[in-house]
Regions:
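Residue in the alpha/beta-hydrolase core beta-strand immediately N-terminal to the catalytic nucleophile
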Residues: 78, 115, 138-141
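Conserved alpha/beta-hydrolase catalytic His-Asp/Glu region
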Residues: 175-218
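Catalytic active-site module of serine/aspartate enzymes centered on a nucleophile-bearing elbow/loop
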Residues: 264-309
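Conserved acidic catalytic loop of the alpha/beta-hydrolase fold
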Residues: 97-114
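Conserved HGGG/HGGXW glycine-rich cap/lid loop of the alpha/beta-hydrolase fold
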Residues: 34-89, 112
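Flexible "cap/lid" loop of the alpha/beta hydrolase fold
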Residues: 127, 131-132, 137-174
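Gly/Ala-rich beta-loop-alpha elbow adjacent to hydrolase catalytic centers
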Residues: 118, 122, 126
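Conserved serine/cysteine hydrolase catalytic core
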Residues: 203-260, 266-269
Length: 309
């Protein structure tokens, strides 16, 4: 969960495209057309769909796309309210199924075997999509996935209360239009205390604007009901869950719940990288993803850790 990356020049094989689909507007079966925005790279091989975290966007995957494009058809989709994908309609409560259908709509029409990669909220969306397409999704990578509702189901009430506190704060100040206040809390929670204070003025403006879709995303991750054991039956055995053992309490507890219920999965711990590692430490996270998806080992340049601000 972080602010969207700055605009970058597009290479010929990493272009911005869109697809006409349907959007839930003001009630069941009331749809209007809209465009699903995504970036793509590569032209052959299995389809890899990349699903970004909150307050980010499809551009967060640009380095990973570069490492995958020679062997996969890669699409990084913008969820509701990101990039050129329209915002979620305020009168409707968002669900994980809504976001999963959006990603499904962005699939190439001739897609066969599908691999999914999701970070944080994108991980929860990827889980839901994999459950919708069990015969087609062959591999799933979850980077600190955030289905917070599992905490309440499992009785992890301290962790659930911590997540609810953040949720309530975003809902309260978002409803008041005080997005800078909400953004400060959000940034410091996920990126560490003092993150907001270190941001430039322009970065604060961008972060506050990018936070707005998260107002609706909380409904999706809090109102889901699928039990942890059911995820074990619905999702592919070839699932990788990556977590920093020192990450925030709710994510640590979610990881523990899934470890206990989904024993056939692979688990990787990357100490000291934090929740935002896919953006701040791609040198450590991307090789894990590339390896698990079955791509040939490539020399992935290690880059220094970046920081918000």
């Amino acid at each position: 969960m972080t602010v969207a990356a700055p605009t970058i020049a597009k290479t010929p094989d990493q272009c911005e495209t869109s697809s006409m689909r349907g959007q839930l507007a003001n009630g069941l079966n009331n749809y209007q057309p809209f465009k699903v925005d995504y970036f793509e790279a590569g032209s052959s091989g299995p389809v890899v769909m990349l699903v970004h975290s909150s307050v980010s966007g499809a551009r967060q995957w640009r380095r990973l796309m570069d490492h995958l494009k020679d062997q996969f058809r890669v699409r990084a989709v913008n969820l509701f309210g990101y990039g050129k994908t329209p915002p979620w309609p305020a009168a409707t409560t968002q669900t994980l199924s809504d976001q999963a259908r959006l990603v499904e709509d962005a699939l190439p029409p001739d897609a066969g075997e599908i691999y999914l990669v999701g970070h944080s909220f994108g991980g929860s969306v990827a889980m839901k999509l994999a459950a919708r397409l069990p015969a087609r999704v062959a591999r799933l990578v979850l980077l600190e996935t955030n289905p917070f509702y599992l905490l309440a189901q499992a009785g992890r009430m301290d962790a659930f209360a911590e997540a609810m506190e953040l949720r309530n704060y975003i809902k309260k100040f978002g409803a008041l239009g005080e997005w800078a206040t909400a953004a400060e809390k959000f940034a410091d929670y996920w990126n560490g205390a003092g993150t907001w204070r270190k941001m430039s003025f322009d970065r604060r403006i961008a972060f506050s604007e990018a936070l707005k879709p998260n107002f609706f995303e909380w409904d999706a991750v809090m109102n889901e009901t699928t039990p942890a054991k059911q995820w074990a039956a619905l999702l592919p055995e070839r699932t990788l869950l990556v977590c920093d053992p020192g990450t925030v309490l709710p994510i640590r507890e979610i990881t523990a719940i899934l470890r206990r219920s989904c024993r056939s999965w692979a688990y990787e711990e990357v100490p000291g990288v934090g929740h935002m590692a896919p953006l701040t430490r791609p040198d450590l996270i991307n090789p894990l993803v590339v390896s698990f998806l079955g791509a040939r080992e490539r020399a992935i340049e290690k880059r220094p850790r970046s920081a918000i601000g």
